[in-house]
Amino acid sequence: MKFGKRLLPLLLTLSMTASLLPAAALAAEADAGEKHITILGTSDMHGNIWGFSYEDNSETANNGMARLYTYIQQTRSENPNTILIDAGDDIQGTIMTDDLYNKTPEDPHPVITAMNYMGYDAMTLGNHEFNWGIPTMQTILGQAEFPVLATNVTDAAGELVTGAGWTIVEKDGVKVAIIGVVTPDVPIWDGGKEGIDGATFEAANVAVGKAIDEIGDQADVIVVSAHMGMYAEFDEEGGSDSAQKILDDNPEIDVLQVAHNHVVVNETQGTTVIGGVRNGGRDIARFDLTLDADNNIVDATVEVVDMTDVAPSQEIRDIPLVAEAHQKTIDYINGGGSGEDGEGGVALGSTTAKFQPENEISGIPAGRVMDTAVMDLINKIQLENSGADVSAAALFKDTSDLPAGDINYGNIFDIYKFDNTLYRVTVTGAELKAYMEWSAECYNQWKEGDINISFDPEYPDYLYDMFAGVDYEIDLSQPKGQRIKNVMFKGEPLQDDQTLTLAVNNYRYSSALKSEG
């Protein structure tokens, strides 16, 4: 549904009555019967219910589902015609989820329990929902009291893995269709896990088009909740994993929610409002629609609201399972990851100094611009355990650190939170340099007059790999693809046809290396 056909009846009505009514009456006539629908969109909450960093054992100041709920309730009090949707990556990402509750999927899950309490109208699958295989995902999400959507994923029997690809929510007589679609790149990262190799992940743009056809005239408003970024991640030619391609092929979409990349998106293309948020519950996307008496959209706006100044909801924290899970996680960390009673306070080791230096320039993380002890540690471990010539690894966030003092499980999770598998693969010098160029794309090109290094917001922290076993330079004055200079291996220039072995985790191998051939 688009503005063009909605505005025409309204404009004709106004033009016919303009000569007959005074200005005040005209305004009242125009406002009569108007409806206001608010759609709130969250995504990539990654298990952060409380607003608490288990790695640092401290409250956070700007994130968490509890903060989101405060804003959600405030919005509902202002406009009861509010719809709440989510674009996935919610049941993964903290010690609470990954090390405790996702390993017992048949037990009540704190994230889904909190989402039920918050009153979600729909959720779209994210790629991280698949991390434990499809049966585990289905068991956990089966606890949801709201539809879970993925219009482009079917199992080996041809059935939608969540049972639904879209749903319709009615508010004030306005029927809002919500279509959920996840990046089709899931098999790149989670292939081999139960149920995934037999599943079909259809191109997002194609699947959304089919869903819109199915919906037909059942809805007044079309919302697409897409767990992917605006631009293609792997399929640059076909755009099967691109929200932009979804919109290009389906311009009748009224609201487009994007996710996955953990970056703020706030824009309008034509008459489609587009919004996306960062990770961990740091923001919420707000879409406000004004419709006339015939349910035609006459105005639409999007805003991404930062949660920094929002207080966490005690209601969410007081949900019995949430409170229990929070304390259970703290006990698990203090017990060295054992989770057993009586084993609290067990240290896994100790350090005499912090491994991450202070930022030399405000706003520019040291972990992104210099060699650090924490990165050296990760690469050293990978080299020693693989016997490879070169190691590549990333910090999952630029500030990941091992602080001075005792080391507990939370500290380890902070610097390496995923259960990846370490691979040793054979590469040529040319292939390694191409990989290094890909990593260096996270920087913006330096231009004359720039006073600081800056980063491309489309590249999250975890996509910047650093390399050990080779010496190299990055020339930021050069465009992407031409930045890696003077690569030295064992004191000699690395030749393109030279063969060496590389230690890299399975995630990066599948996404940045194998997928490139």
Please report, for each region that a protein language model flagged, where it lies by residue:
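Bacterial N-terminal signal peptides that target proteins for export
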Residues: 1-11
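Intrinsically disordered, low-complexity repeat and linker tracts
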Residues: 2-3, 24-32
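Feature captures C-terminal
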Residues: 36-38, 48, 56-63, 67, ...
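N-terminal accessory/precursor segments of enzymes
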Residues: 180-186, 190-191, 302-304, 342, ...
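A short C-terminal boundary segment appended to hydrolase-like catalytic domains
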Residues: 291-407
